[in-house]
UniProtKB/Swiss-Prot annotation:
It comes from the Bacteria. NCBIfam families: rumA. The active site is at 411 (nucleophile). Keywords: 4Fe-4S, Iron, Iron-sulfur, Metal-binding, Methyltransferase, S-adenosyl-L-methionine, Transferase. GO terms for molecular function: 4 iron, 4 sulfur cluster binding; metal ion binding; rRNA (uridine-C5-)-methyltransferase activity. Belongs to the class I-like SAM-binding methyltransferase superfamily. RNA M5U methyltransferase family. GO terms for biological process: rRNA base methylation. Gene3D superfamilies: 2.40.50.1070, Nucleic acid-binding proteins, Vaccinia Virus protein VP39. The keyword Transferase applies. S-adenosyl-L-methionine binds at residues 286, 315, 336, 384. This is Uncharacterized RNA methyltransferase SAS1819. Its EC number is 2.1.1.-. It comes from Staphylococcus aureus (strain MSSA476).
Length: 453
C-alpha cells in the first residue's frame, strides 16, 4: 500500500459518504475520512491523523465540485458542531439518509424483501427546533459567551443566531447574555468546576407559542434571581414560565433533578394535530413538531387501526404517540420506566379526555408479562426506545407475546437494525420509512413495520 503519513498533502476522488457525512477517499482500499467533502468531488487534502484502519484528512481545495454542493448560509458553520450538512443540498441530504437506511437494512442485514421508502423531508428545513440547550461560558477576555460547542469539544462558539433554532430562542439568548453581563452573574467554568450559570434552555410550543425559559445553575443560591426575572419579563412579557434548574453535578448532563418555578406555570402546552400535551422542563418531547406529526401519522398508517385494536405503547414517555393513537384504538396501554413521565402521561390523558388509556410505571418487559397474566393481548405494539435500542429481554418478551404488528420508531437506525434481526425469528420486516427530524445534520429517524409471520 502507498505510504500514508501525518501532514501528507494528497489528491483524490471522493467515492462515498460516511454516516457522519464525511467524504471517503481510498488509497489502495485504505479509507481516508474528510469532513465537508462530497461524493464525486476531486479534492486536495491534508492527512491530520493516521490510525490502523483509517485516516482523517482536512479538505484543502476542491478541484471538481459536486453538483450537490451549496453555500452554507450560517456564518458559524465552519466552527460550530451543531450542523454537519449545510454544504449539501437538501434534496441530497434526504437521499443520503435513505442510503444510510438501505445500507443498514438491505446491504448489511439482508432484509432484501423489505421496502425502504424515500426520506420524508420538510418544505422549509430551517428554524425547526422547539427546544434549545445553550451552554454559557467565558472567553479569554473574561466576557460572557453563549452559543454551541465546537465539534467534538466543549469549546463554546459565541453566537448571536442559529438557523435551526426557533427564531425566538436566539432573541432570548442574546437578551439573556446582555442581562448576565449587566448584573454580573457568576458564570460556571467547566474546567475549574466553579461558578453559577451553566446553561440556558428555551422551550416553545410550536402550535401555541407558549415559551418556557430555564436557567441551569450550579447550586440553588442565586443573588440576582429576582432582577433577572424582572428583566426577562420586560423583554418578553408573553413568556409563560421561567424556571431555575439546579445541577451541581460535575458531569456532562445538562439538567439536574430539582427545578424551581420562578414565574408563571410549571409547564407549557403544545399540540400535535388534535392532541394537547403539557410539557415540563424535564419532559421528553420531540424537537421538530412539524416532522413529528408526519412521523406519527406514518406510525398510525402502519398500525392499521380500525377502532377495535388493543395497542401497547412501550417506552411511552409523556404519552405522545399513545394519546395520538387513542382515538383510533379500542384501548392503549402505555408503560415507561420514568415516574415523572408517567405522571405527565396520565395528566395528558385527562386533558385530552382519553378514557381508553392506561399508563403504568415500570420496566416494559415486566409490565407486559403482568398484563399478559391479566388476559390483556395487544394487537399492535408501539416501540420508541432511546438511542441504545431495546433491551434483549424486552425483545424476547415481545416474541412470546406475538402481537400481529410491531411499529418501531427509532432515533438510531443502527440499533433498530440490530433489534430487527432478533425480531426476524417471528416477524417479517415489511418496510422502513426514514423521516428527517433534524435537517442540516446527519441524524435520521425511522419508523418500521413488522408483521407476524
Amino acid at each position: 500500500m502507498q505510504a500514508i503519513a501525518k501532514n501528507d498533502i494528497k489528491t483524490g476522488t471522493v467515492v462515498d459518504l460516511t454516516h457522519e457525512g464525511h467524504g471517503v477517499v481510498k488509497i489502495d482500499r485504505f479509507p481516508i475520512f474528510i469532513p465537508q467533502a462530497l461524493i464525486n468531488e476531486q479534492i486536495e487534502y491534508k492527512i491530520i491523523k493516521v490510525k490502523k484502519n483509517f485516516a482523517i484528512g482536512k479538505l484543502l481545495n476542491i478541484n471538481t465540485r459536486s453538483e450537490n454542493r451549496v453555500a452554507p448560509p450560517c456564518i458559524y458553520y465552519e466552527r460550530c458542531g451543531g450542523c454537519q450538512l449545510q454544504h449539501l443540498s437538501y434534496e441530497a441530504q434526504l437521499e443520503m439518509k435513505k442510503e444510510q437506511v438501505i445500507n443498514l437494512f438491505q446491504r448489511k442485514a439482508h432484509f432484501d424483501n423489505s421496502k425502504i421508502n424515500d426520506t420524508v423531508g420538510m418544505t422549509d428545513p430551517w428554524r425547526y427546533r422547539n427546544k434549545s440547550q445553550i451552554p454559557v461560558g467565558k472567553n479569554e477576555q473574561n466576557e460572557v459567551i453563549m452559543g454551541f460547542y465546537r465539534q467534538r469539544s466543549h469549546d463554546i462558539i459565541d453566537m448571536e443566531s442559529c438557523l435551526i433554532q426557533d427564531s425566538q430562542h436566539q432573541e432570548v439568548m442574546n437578551e439573556v447574555k446582555s442581562i448576565l453581563k449587566d448584573l454580573n452573574v457568576s458564570i460556571y467554568q467547566e474546567q475549574l468546576k466553579k461558578g453559577l450559570m451553566r446553561h440556558l434552555v428555551v422551550r416553545t410550543g410550536y402550535h401555541t407559542d407558549e415559551m418556557m425559559i430555564i436557567f441551569v445553575t450550579n447550586g440553588k443560591k442565586w443573588p440576582q434571581k429576582n432582577a433577572v426575572v424582572e428583566k426577562i419579563l420586560d423583554a418578553f412579557p408573553n413568556v409563560t414560565s421561567i424556571k431555575q434548574n439546579i445541577n451541581d453535578s460535575h458531569s456532562n448532563v445538562i439538567m439536574g433533578r430539582q427545578s424551581i418555578t420562578l414565574y408563571g406555570k410549571d409547564t407549557i402546552i403544545d399540540q400535535l394535530t388534535d392532541s394537547t400535551f403539557k410539557i415540563s422542563d424535564q419532559s421528553f418531547y420531540q424537537i421538530n413538531s412539524e416532522q413529528t406529526e408526519k412521523l406519527y401519522n406514518k406510525a398510525i398508517e402502519y398500525a392499521q387501526l380500525t377502532g377495535n385494536e388493543v395497542v401497547l405503547d412501550t417506552y411511552c414517555g409523556i404519552g405522545t404517540i399513545g394519546l395520538y393513537m387513542a382515538p383510533h384504538a379500542k384501548h392503549v396501554y402505555g408503560v415507561e420506566v420514568v415516574p415523572s413521565a408517567i405522571e405527565d402521561a396520565q395528566q395528558n390523558a385527562t386533558i385530552n379526555q382519553c378514557n381508553n388509556t392506561t399508563f403504568v410505571c415500570g420496566k416494559a418487559e415486566e409490565v407486559i408479562l403482568q398484563w399478559k397474566a391479566q388476559g390483556i393481548k395487544p394487537d399492535v405494539v408501539m416501540v420508541d426506545p432511546p438511542r441504545k435500542g431495546c433491551d434483549e429481554t424486552f425483545i424476547q418478551t415481545l416474541l412470546t407475546l406475538e402481537p400481529k404488528r410491531i411499529v418501531y420508531i427509532s432515533c438510531n437506525p443502527a440499533t433498530q437494525q440490530r433489534d430487527a434481526l432478533l425480531l426476524a425469528e417471528k416477524y417479517q420486516l415489511e418496510e422502513v420509512t426514514p423521516v428527517d427530524m433534524f435537517p442540516q445534520t446527519t441524524h435520521v429517524e425511522t419508523v418500521a413495520l413488522f408483521n407476524l409471520k
